[in-house]
Amino acid sequence: MNATAQALVLPFITQVTRAVSLSENVKVLGGIPFAEDGTYLEWLSILGFTIGCYYVIYTFYALCFHPLRKYPGPWHLAVSNIPNRWSTISGNSSYWLYDLHEKYGPIVRVAPNEISYSDPQAWQDIYGPQPNQRLGMPKDPKFFSSFEDKKTAASIITSQPKDYMRMRHIYSYGFSKQVMLAKEEMIQGIIDRAMEALRQTKQQPQDIVQIFRATDFSIVTEIVFGKAYHIFDRPTYQPWFKSLMGWIRSTAVITATTDYPLGKLAAWLLTPRSVLKQRNVYLKYVNGEIEERIGESNAGRKDVVQLMFETTDQPKLAESDIRANLPFMVIAASETTTTLMSGMIAHLLNSPDALSQLTAEVRGRFRSPSDITIATVNNLPFLNACVNEALRVYPAAPTQLPRVVPGEGATVCNRWVPGGTKVYVAPYATFRSAENFYQPDAFLPQRWLPENGESFDVDKKNAWRPFGLGAHECPGQVITNLITRLIMCKLLLSFDLELCADSQDWLSRQPVWIVWDKPELLIKARPAAA
């Protein structure tokens, strides 16, 4: 249809230009040629009429002849992707997709050339290995390139399969349990400092989201750069960690405008100035730290940067690879962990029975904070169930990650999809679907226990993929799971928690810009009785 549009419209543009140039009565008003005899307006009207006809024809084509015409969904989404993109810009995309799936079912056409799924089978069909696509379907290049701020090298997000596997090997090891064990003393020290900061509040309301964020950020920067920034004690770095959401939100807007001409300009105009300022603050700090770390010795650092320099994989990673990857990796590792812990504690504080059961499990297992280690926190069944349930009702990464169907086409959920179609699983809609889970909107950790009862037999556990599936599964999930368990155990062992009245509706309709835009979660922490 693009060729058709050109064939219809371009001749009229030429005629308008010619008519104006041939007119003997042309005046220039404000730099615009204007024919006094009305020729210019006449041809301009014809041009407008032609463009209108084109869109009428395109609408007819999209509804009646497009290869996706038989897929369910509202008609207006079949002719325009603007509603879809606006849902991202406005922070409403996860709820918007949820509502569509509730109305139209597990497969919905959400744009002229775009399909969203909440069917568990779609995880495997889209993201899982295929005979001719071992990394799953190709990533949507426009969407994922939006995460890159440096263009000197492709990051792990947009790299080709061979380079991707090489980078993934490094990052998976850098965020592995083995590395965390080597740095456990440092990690425990940061968490203990957070607990001490909470103790010093003397039971006054505190924003637990910011405490989690400062803790996670300090741990991740130690793992990545080989030094912790100790946000609680070094105010110099507080603007850096407080700017994380600015980078995330502005990136979300960029992903929504890449399909349009002048997309970057549109993103700049549609992003609040305060958010753009935060983005610049984040990039200033992180790029400064990257340059400083590159200039330092690798001896004894045992951080991700050292791993990148010393990898035996060929070809070796260059400084440009470090600059391309680390701005995103710092956020991906820290903010998803903060999101998981914030959602988990909010649901626990709104579920007294679950909170009581988890607190009893933690205090029954550990006698002092020193007993809580990386080696011991995984052996708590109800804690594991609470983490899993938090990831279901409040996924750390609720945003859809689009793939593009290969040119030869593919079968997704037993239906043929033509090549070039953008496809994805909508995580929030999938995890909250009654087709996939019993009482999907309730926080019920017991669904993940072996003795969960017959009610949960209907649960489709294969629908639950909080960190993705296949070769592109999140390499930082190990660190997210371990940090969450360490902090939750120390928090519940040391304090009795109370949700403040101002945060009773904290879980209500939070905006989503890649991750949840988390408001203050005010709690009171009373030291637990010895």
UniProtKB/Swiss-Prot annotation:
Q: Which residues cross the membrane?
A: 43-63
Name its cellular compartments.
Membrane
Query: Where, in this chain's numbering, is heme bound?
Result: C474
Q: What class of enzyme is it?
A: oxidoreductase
| GO process annotations (BP) | biosynthetic process
Q: How does it sit in the membrane?
A: Single-pass membrane protein
Q: Which GO terms describe its molecular function?
A: heme binding; iron ion binding; monooxygenase activity; oxidoreductase activity, acting on paired donors, with incorporation or reduction of molecular oxygen
This entry carries the following GO cellular component terms, namely: membrane
Glycosylation site positions: N2, N92
Cystine pairs = none
One Pfam family here: p450
User: Sorted alphabetically, which SUPFAM superfamilies does this protein's record hold?
Assistant: Cytochrome P450
Q: What does the record give as EC number?
A: 1.-.-.-
| Knocked-out gene: effects | Abolishes the formation of aculene A and accumulates a major product,asperculane A, along with two minor products, asperculane C and 14-prolyl asperculane C.
* Entry cofactors: heme
Source domain of life is Eukaryota
Which key words are in the record?
A: Glycoprotein, Heme, Iron, Membrane, Metal-binding, Monooxygenase, Oxidoreductase, Transmembrane, Transmembrane helix
- Report the catalytic activity: asperaculane E + reduced [NADPH--hemoprotein reductase] + O2 = asperaculane G + oxidized [NADPH--hemoprotein reductase] + H2O + H(+); asperaculane G + reduced [NADPH--hemoprotein reductase] + O2 = aculene D + oxidized [NADPH--hemoprotein reductase] + CO2 + 2 H2O; asperaculane E + 2 reduced [NADPH--hemoprotein reductase] + 2 O2 = aculene D + 2 oxidized [NADPH--hemoprotein reductase] + CO2 + 3 H2O + H(+)
| Protein's pathway | Secondary metabolite biosynthesis
Report the protein's function.
Answer: Cytochrome P450 monooxygenase; part of the gene cluster that mediates the biosynthesis of aculenes, a unique type of norsesquiterpenes that contain a nordaucane skeleton linked to an L-proline moiety and are of mixed biosynthetic origin. The pathway begins with the synthesis of dauca-4,7-diene by the terpene cyclase aneC using farnesyl pyrophosphate (FPP) as substrate.
Q: Which family does it belong to?
A: Belongs to the cytochrome P450 family.
Q: Can you say what this protein is called?
A: Cytochrome P450 monooxygenase aneG
Q: Which organism is it from?
A: Aspergillus aculeatus (strain ATCC 16872 / CBS 172.66 / WB 5094)
Gene name per UniProt: aneG
